[in-house]
């Protein structure tokens, strides 16, 4: 059931926390700030509390993606490099993106012979990625494509033809069209999407937040 809990002074770092009968707590990743509070989907008679879980990274305070970063880090989707550093302009590997998307979809990532093994298997099972090249940095085309696949590959009504650098027969054309249609990206300006550019940690936060609104 989708509900909205009234909250004053809500910020992107404001999250809903599910309190289980045994007292354990779990952040509700799909709890999204609205104009008047927090919207989330809950099952049955859940006990929920609202907390400010913003991390306060010192290197994002004046960054264009501060709100996006506050949102994803408060929900445990993207971790900081440390308690105080997010490193918004750093690139992201394929293994890191598998992990982020697996977390978003509540996959169990405990165990595995390497830290990304469970996320890698999840990505392959769900058709999000072929699971190769875990240490390779992702570009913008790969980011949007994996996000689209993780969201169920819904067809876009339009096309990505408004971008001069997205060929209609490219593997990522449908994903870019979907992302534009859903307000996830507007490109980089000048009629370009810049598919081959490295996708920074700030851009990943922005793509994720917009996809969850």
Segments predicted by a language model, with ranges:
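Exposed aromatic-hydrophobic patches
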Residues: 2-7, 37-43
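Feature responds to low-complexity, polar/acidic, surface-exposed segments characteristic
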Residues: 24-32, 41-67, 74, 79-141, ...
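Short, structured motif recognition centered on aromatic/hydrophobic residues
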Residues: 98, 204-205
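PLP-dependent class I/II
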Residues: 21, 34-37
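Proteolytic processing hotspots in large secreted/extracellular or virion-associated proteins
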Residues: 1-15, 20-22
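Acidic helix/loop microenvironments that form the catalytic cleft of cell-wall polysaccharide enzymes
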Residues: 199-203
């Amino acid at each position: 059931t989708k509900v909205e809990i009234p909250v004053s002074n809500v910020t992107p770092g404001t999250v809903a926390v599910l309190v289980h009968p045994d007292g354990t707590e779990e952040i509700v990743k799909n709890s999204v700030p609205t104009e008047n509070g927090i919207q989330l989907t809950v099952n049955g008679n859940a006990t929920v509390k609202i907390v400010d879980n913003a991390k306060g990274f010192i290197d994002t305070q004046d960054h264009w993606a501060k709100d996006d970063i506050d949102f994803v880090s408060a929900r445990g989707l993207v971790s900081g490099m440390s308690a105080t550093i997010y490193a918004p302009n750093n690139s992201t590997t394929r293994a890191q993106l598998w992990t982020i998307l697996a977390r978003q979809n509540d996959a169990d990532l405990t165990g595995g012979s390497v830290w990304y093994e469970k996320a890698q298997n999840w990505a392959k099972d769900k058709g999000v990625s072929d699971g190769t090249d875990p240490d390779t940095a992702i570009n913008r085309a790969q980011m949007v494509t994996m996000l689209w696949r993780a969201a169920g590959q819904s067809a876009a009504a339009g096309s990505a033809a408004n971008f001069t650098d997205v060929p209609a027969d490219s593997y990522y054309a449908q994903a870019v069209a979907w992302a534009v249609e859903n307000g996830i990206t507007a490109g980089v300006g000048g009629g370009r999407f810049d598919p081959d550019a490295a996708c920074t940690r700030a851009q990943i936060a922005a793509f994720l937040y917009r996809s969850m609104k």
